[in-house]
Amino acid sequence: MSDLMTEQKRYYAERAPEYDDWWYRRGRYALEPRALERWHADAAEAEDALEAFPPGRSVLELAAGTGIWTRKLVRLADRVVAVDANAETLALNTSDAELVQADVFEWESGERFDLVFFSFWLSHVPDVRFDEFWAHVRAALAPDDRVFLVDSGAGETGHTGTDQAGGEETRSLSDGRTFRIVKRRWLPDELAERVRRLGFELDLHDSANGHFLYGGGALA
């Protein structure tokens, strides 16, 4: 599993210059107009849910990547600490956040935040490290603080990738190179039950057109 996680980390480092093409549906991720309208509607649904949550004054964003959601968070919170393992992705993130290059499984802030946020990360956490990751989330929260996540919907196929057995996926870059990554698409009820056993109570939803899973909650 460590080899797979190393390959996944390298994939996202190499993908950094083209990562945003997926979110903005450019190039090989382009959609025909009606499909693009559905994509934008789902993105707006998730964004509106985050804004209505709302984040609070201080936010810890884990696996922040190139900053697609960081830029939304800095408009909603007074302070955002954005952590990612790759310098290549953080170089494209926003200077309005406090950027930290670190492995999210190892980094400890020693602080408590009003909100812990992560987008399109949980589906890349291997099952053997799932509980460990949520322990890190818990450590960054005071009892009344909260968590919010956005991820791929269970039926989402918007990436250029091939599903493999055992929660893996083969992804390709625009230059043709391929990488293996972890990828598990969760159903809302399935994920809510899994984290409930770890002491979190989350209200999770699929977006109207099925592209995203999103929602939040707090320690139970």
Feature annotation, model-predicted:
Residues 131-143:
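A short glycine-rich, Lys/Arg-flanked "PGG" loop and its adjoining helix->strand segment in the class I
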Residues 200-212:
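Conserved S-adenosyl-L-methionine
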Residues 1-54:
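Conserved class I S-adenosyl-L-methionine
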Residues 60-107:
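Class I SAM-dependent methyltransferase SAM/SAH-binding core
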Residues 120-124:
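Short catalytic micro-motifs in class I SAM-dependent methyltransferases
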Residues 117:
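A conserved beta-strand element that flanks and buttresses the S-adenosyl-L-methionine
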Residues 150-197, 205:
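C-terminal alpha-helical "lid/dimerization" subdomain adjacent to the S-adenosyl-L-methionine
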